[in-house]
Amino acid sequence: MNTMTLTPGQLSLSQLYDVWRHPVQLRLDASAIDGINASVACVNDIVAEGRTAYGINTGFGLLAQTRIADEDLQNLQRSLVLSHAAGVGDPLDDAMVRLIMVLKINSLARGCSGIRLSVIEALIALVNAGVYPLIPAKGSVGASGDLAPLAHLSLMLLGEGKARWQGEWLPAQTALKKAGLEPVALAAKEGLALLNGTQASTAFALRGLFEAQELFASAVVCGALTTEAVLGSRRPFDARIHAARGQQGQIDVARLFRHLLTDTSAIAESHHHCHKVQDPYSLRCQPQVMGACLTQLRQTKEVLLAEANAVSDNPLVFADAGEVISGGNFHAEPVAMAADNLALAIAEIGALSERRIALMMDKHMSQLPPFLVKNGGVNSGFMIAQVTAAALASENKALAHPHSVDSLPTSANQEDHVSMAPAAGRRLWEMVANTRGIIAVEWLAACQGIDLREGLTSSPLLEQARQTLRERVAHYTQDRFFAPDIECATALLAQGALQRLVPDFM
């Protein structure tokens, strides 16, 4: 199990990926403790001095003007968590819950939230013990923070709700007891600090980003395979073309294609002196289209990494000045817009792949047997596999509709503009699955196309890609049950089978 020392505000993308992929043992860096304690002391001073401060001794949302008596402050925080745990939908999986929890710990430990070290340590203990609260997938509009998901997370600290421990759903009290943990009582400000934040939205979008990186690499490899299968030209990847435009993503993608399409390809040599002038756009413009997608991936990375390390609580405690200030860092608009832009990239990666599949089906364009199978008529070959890819690409076009422009007012119009970031991030998962299915079909088709260039081989790296598939999926000599082959190729892609052939591009 990975051990990670968490220095608040300094999580890297690779650390976040590891948290998502694997259980982790967290340790809070000692440098965070003074700031945490100072913020708590500031909150305690406000209560002791009788000053009114939102979230400390007031109601919430439209009820912010209601002053709460000192003797009710602890009950106020507990009631807040219980009432806001109103999510619906399927429970998030352990990986997603773990990522949300670590993001929440990272934010709270920045020392601007007025939450005690003991509460943060209780969250760390849940992560380390593998106790994952039941968090329904739906119910947040991404402002004021991800209230419902984070309330379900926080229920666990109170001994309420349910959790999964060692693969079993248990009542919270039972899960805590089995893990050797105790519930906590929340003090002033702590319930609000736990609930306010963009951690669910950010985690949803991060998963989309992590999987989009794999899709991108796989699509580049399959695009290169298809280029070989249809005897496409390598000239469009010439560095001089892309330097003349100056778009960095395009320049970098062309370099990836040159890395894959080396001069040691017998296929390339076989048509070196052909008279074809230009390839279709789905081949020739791969650096331009995929380069634009890469730019979106990189921009999304920057936004999400900043948000993963942000303090998105409200109000914020500035202990050095003894002030508590209400703001709007809980508004997840940056995450929503980043997820929307990432959705465009995922849709385009799939759309371009589908066009390359269609190209291989057309004997006039590909110079291959129709639908990539001999004895056509008796055999239908890849005919319906391409239809499946088209269906998935079409679904992605609808799913790519932006969520950040869709706001509905809540809390009696006190919270009158929201981000819809959770939905923006969550739909990425379905888009990823669709695009992975498209790329799987292209991988199958491109390898079949190269097989049909009998006696000719591609570059060493692309031959590795073909061999990886052929170890699990046989060449098509005649029609057979097709769906298991798509499932197999899809699973291999999800495991990073092609991603490892591409140098780091982020």
From Swiss-Prot:
Leading EC class: lyase
Reaction catalysis annotation: L-histidine = trans-urocanate + NH4(+)
Record carries keyword Ubl conjugation: no
2,3-didehydroalanine (Ser) found at: S144
Origin superkingdom: Bacteria
Post-translational modification: Contains an active site 4-methylidene-imidazol-5-one (MIO), which is formed autocatalytically by cyclization and dehydration of residues Ala-Ser-Gly.
Molecular function terms from GO: histidine ammonia-lyase activity
Record localization: Cytoplasm
A single GO BP: L-histidine catabolic process to glutamate and formate
Pathway annotation from the record: Amino-acid degradation; L-histidine degradation into L-glutamate; N-formimidoyl-L-glutamate from L-histidine: step 1/3
EC number: 4.3.1.3
5-imidazolinone (Ala-Gly) cross-link site: A143-G145
Keywords: Cytoplasm, Histidine metabolism, Lyase
GO CC term (a single one): cytoplasm
NCBIfam families in UniProt: hutH, PRK09367.1
Family the entry assigns: Belongs to the PAL/histidase family.
Protein name: Histidine ammonia-lyase
Provenance organism: Salmonella choleraesuis (strain SC-B67)
Lineage: Bacteria, Pseudomonadati, Pseudomonadota, Gammaproteobacteria, Enterobacterales
